[in-house]
C-alpha cells in the first residue's frame, strides 16, 4: 500500500524571458601537480550570472546540422564524420553508432572507450524499440567493504587506480548491437578507428584543455602519461598523436569480434596489469562478461511516447517519474525558468531521485524492485499532490513505496532507424590507468561504497546498490527516443554528466515538447539541477533572473550557482518538416553531420 510521508513546494510566478543565454563559461582546470606547462589553479566560487532581457541565443553553427535523409551527432567532430561516412556508404544507424563509438575511443579518450561500458536504445524502422545494457560489472573478487579503511571510512580506491575498475562492457555491447541489428561487415566499422589510432589525429582545443586539466591523474600512471603528458608536458592543441598499441587492440577486435578483446592477448594484458597494480579483474571475469538485451521502459508525456533505459540505469525511471508527476502541470504556460517552473520541477526531481537512490540497482541482484509501482500514474499523482508552495526538508522526502565522464551519440538513418547510445568511463579519464593504449574505467565508484556516504557525484545511495561480485552498478545514463502521438519518430537524445544526465535530458525533451523550441535552442538553453542530496538547487549561468533566485531562497531552497560543464553535455536529433536537425551541446565540442 502506498502511504505519503510529507513533501513540498510551489506557486508564486515571476516573469522570465525565454530568450536563450550566452554560452556557459569553460570548466575550471585542476591544480598544478608538477606538470611542465603551468596548470591553472581552481577559481573561487563563481559569482551568480543572472538571466536578463539581453541574454541572447547561443547556438554554434558548427554544432548544428541538417539532413534530409540521415543525421549523426557526437561529442567529437572526427567521430561524427566517421559515423556519417558509414551512413553515406550504405550502412544503417546501428552501423554508424558502432563506428562512431569506436572512433570516440580514440579521439575522445576522456570518455569514449574500450575500457568502459554503457547503454543503447534502438528504434527500428517498424517502430519497435529495444534496449541494450553493456554496463560494467564488479569483478568476481569484489566485496561490499573493499573501499573502506580500518575505521570504515571510504577511500579514494573506488576512483583512482587499478582497483577502481569494473569489468568493461563496451566492446561486448558493440558486438551485440552488430549481431542483432547491424548491416555492414563488422571489419568496416572498426577500421576507421584503427586508422585514427595508427596514423594519428590532431588534438583539438577541447581535448588539449582536458588533458591539461587532468594531467595530475594521468601522471600517476606511466602508460597514460607517455601518451597524453609526454615528458610531463600535456599534449597541445594542434599537435598530432598516434596510439599504436590502441591500433593493435582495435585490430584484434576487428579480426576477432568481442573475443578479440575478452580473450587472447588483450585480455591477458588487462589481467596482467590488473594483478601488477592490485586490481581485481581477471581473465575469467573478462571471458565471462555478457551484454544484456532488455525491454525498454515506455512512458507517456503530452501525447508522446518516451522509450528509455530500465535498471540498472536509473535514468529511465527518473525521466518516467518526472513525466508522470508533471502530467497535470502546463509547463508551457509558465514563465520559462520563473519561480513556479523551477520550483515544480525541482520538487518532482527531489522525489524521483529519493526513490532512485534508495530502491534501484541491478535487477539480477535486487529482487522485487518496484519499477512498475514507481511508474504507476496513481502513485505519481499522489506524489505530485504532496508538492506545496515552499521547499520541503530533504529528511521528509523519501520513496513512498512499501515493500564528466560520459559521452553520448545519436543517429538516425534514411529508413527511420534511430540509435541513442551512451558510454562512459565514469569520471573524465576514468581510473587513470591505461592498458594497451586504452583507459580503464573507475565505475566501481557508482556502487554504494558505504550507505549514507556520497560518491564523487554527491549521490547518497542505499544497500540495493551495494557491491557484489558480477553485479552491474547503478547508472544515470538516459539514452531516450521519443515518438509523437502518431507513433512517428520525433526526437533522439542522450547526454553526459553523471546524475545531471537525467535532468539535462529531461530539460531538452521539455524544451521541445512544452516550449516548442528548435533542437539547437533546446540544448543551448541554460539548466538547473537537483538530485535530492546534496539538498541544493544548482543553477547554471544565465539560467534564472535575480528575482527568481530571491523567491527560491525565500521558499527555503539553498541555491548554488555553478559554472562549466557541470550541467551535462547533451546531443540530440529532432525531426523537422524536410528531414532531421541535429545539435551538439555548446557546452562540449561536438558536431552534427547530416545528408
Question: Could you tell me what each predicted segment is?
Answer:
Residues 293, 403-406, 475-477:
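Short, small/polar residue-rich loop motifs at catalytic or cofactor-binding pockets
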Residues 86-87, 172-180, 256-263, 268, ...:
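Alpha-helical support elements that line or immediately flank enzyme active sites
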Residues 1-14:
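Sec-dependent bacterial lipoprotein signal peptides
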Residues 38-81, 93-94, 98-257, 261-263, ...:
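Noncatalytic scaffold domains of N-terminal-nucleophile
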Residues 16-19:
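Bacterial signal peptide processing site
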Residues 470-472, 505-506, 514-564:
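Extended C-terminal subregions enriched in glycine
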Residues 106-131, 280-282, 417-485, 515, ...:
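Active-site rim segments in enzyme catalytic domains, especially the processed small/beta chain
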Residues 50, 328-424, 435, 451-452, ...:
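Internal maturation/activation junctions in enzymes
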Amino acid at each position: 500500500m502506498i502511504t505519503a510521508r510529507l513533501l513540498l513546494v510551489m506557486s508564486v510566478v515571476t516573469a522570465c524571458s525565454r530568450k536563450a543565454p550566452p554560452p556557459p563559461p569553460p570548466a575550471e582546470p585542476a591544480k598544478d601537480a608538477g606538470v611542465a606547462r603551468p596548470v591553472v589553479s581552481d577559481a573561487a566560487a563563481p559569482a551568480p550570472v543572472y538571466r536578463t532581457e539581453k541574454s541572447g541565443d547561443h547556438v554554434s553553427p558548427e554544432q548544428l546540422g541538417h539532413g534530409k535523409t540521415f543525421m549523426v551527432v557526437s561529442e567529437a567532430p572526427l567521430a561524427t564524420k566517421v559515423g556519417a561516412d558509414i551512413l553515406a556508404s550504405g550502412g544503417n544507424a546501428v552501423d554508424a553508432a558502432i563506428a562512431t563509438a569506436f572512433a570516440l575511443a580514440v579521439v575522445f579518450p576522456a570518455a569514449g572507450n574500450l575500457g568502459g561500458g554503457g547503454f543503447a536504445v534502438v528504434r527500428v524502422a517498424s517502430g519497435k524499440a529495444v534496449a541494450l545494457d553493456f554496463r560494467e560489472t564488479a569483478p568476481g573478487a569484489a566485496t561490499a567493504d573493499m573501499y573502506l579503511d580500518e575505521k570504515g571510512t571510504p577511500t579514494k580506491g573506488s576512483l583512482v587506480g587499478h582497483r577502481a575498475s569494473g569489468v568493461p562492457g563496451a566492446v561486448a555491447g558493440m558486438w551485440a548491437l552488430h549481431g542483432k541489428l547491424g548491416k555492414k561487415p563488422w571489419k568496416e566499422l572498426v577500421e576507421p578507428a584503427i586508422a585514427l589510432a595508427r596514423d594519428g589525429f590532431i588534438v583539438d582545443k577541447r581535448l588539449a584543455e582536458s588533458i591539461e586539466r587532468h594531467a595530475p591523474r594521468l601522471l600517476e600512471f606511466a602508460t597514460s602519461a607517455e601518451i597524453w603528458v609526454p615528458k610531463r608536458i600535456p599534449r597541445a592543441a594542434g599537435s598530432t598523436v598516434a596510439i599504436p598499441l590502441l591500433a593493435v587492440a582495435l585490430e584484434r577486435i576487428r579480426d576477432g569480434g568481442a573475443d578479440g578483446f575478452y580473450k587472447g592477448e588483450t585480455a591477458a594484458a588487462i589481467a596482467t596489469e590488473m594483478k601488477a597494480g592490485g586490481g581485481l579483474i581477471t581473465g575469467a571475469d573478462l571471458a565471462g562478461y555478457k551484454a544484456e538485451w532488455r525491454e525498454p521502459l515506455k512512458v507517456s508525456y503530452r501525447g508522446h511516447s518516451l522509450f528509455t533505459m530500465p535498471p540498472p540505469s536509473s535514468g529511465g525511471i527518473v525521466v518516467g517519474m518526472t513525466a508522470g508527476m508533471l502530467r497535470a502541470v502546463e509547463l508551457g504556460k509558465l514563465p520559462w525558468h520563473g519561480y513556479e517552473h523551477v520550483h515544480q520541477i525541482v520538487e518532482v526531481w527531489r522525489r524521483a531521485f529519493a526513490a532512485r537512490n534508495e530502491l534501484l540497482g541491478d535487477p539480477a541482484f535486487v529482487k522485487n524492485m518496484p519499477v512498475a509501482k514507481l511508474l504507476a500514474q496513481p502513485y505519481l499523482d499522489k506524489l505530485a499532490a504532496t508538492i506545496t508552495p515552499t521547499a520541503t526538508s530533504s529528511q521528509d522526502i523519501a520513496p513512498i513505496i512499501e515493500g564528466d565522464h560520459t559521452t553520448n551519440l545519436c543517429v538516425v538513418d534514411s529508413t527511420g532507424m534511430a540509435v541513442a547510445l551512451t558510454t562512459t568511463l565514469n569520471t573524465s579519464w576514468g581510473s587513470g590507468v591505461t592498458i594497451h593504449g586504452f583507459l580503464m574505467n573507475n565505475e566501481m565508484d557508482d556502487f554504494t561504497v558505504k550507505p549514507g556516504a556520497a560518491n564523487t557525484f554527491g549521490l547518497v545511495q542505499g544497500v540495493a546498490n551495494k557491491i557484489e561480485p558480477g553485479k552491474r552498478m547503478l547508472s544515470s545514463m538516459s539514452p531516450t527516443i521519443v515518438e509523437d502521438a502518431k507513433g512517428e519518430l520525433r526526437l533522439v537524445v542522450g547526454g553526459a554528466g553523471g546524475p545531471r544526465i537525467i535532468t539535462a535530458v529531461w530539460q531538452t525533451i521539455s524544451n521541445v515538447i512544452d516550449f516548442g523550441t528548435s533542437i539547437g535552442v533546446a540544448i543551448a538553453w541554460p539548466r538547473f539541477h537537483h538530485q535530492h542530496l546534496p539538498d541544493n538547487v544548482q543553477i547554471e549561468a544565465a539560467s534564472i533572473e535575480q528575482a527568481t533566485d530571491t523567491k527560491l531562497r525565500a521558499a527555503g531552497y539553498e541555491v548554488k550557482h555553478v559554472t562549466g560543464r557541470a550541467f551535462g553535455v547533451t546531443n540530440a536529433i529532432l525531426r523537422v518538416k524536410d528531414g532531421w536537425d541535429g545539435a551538439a551541446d555548446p557546452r562540449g565540442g561536438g558536431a552534427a553531420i547530416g545528408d
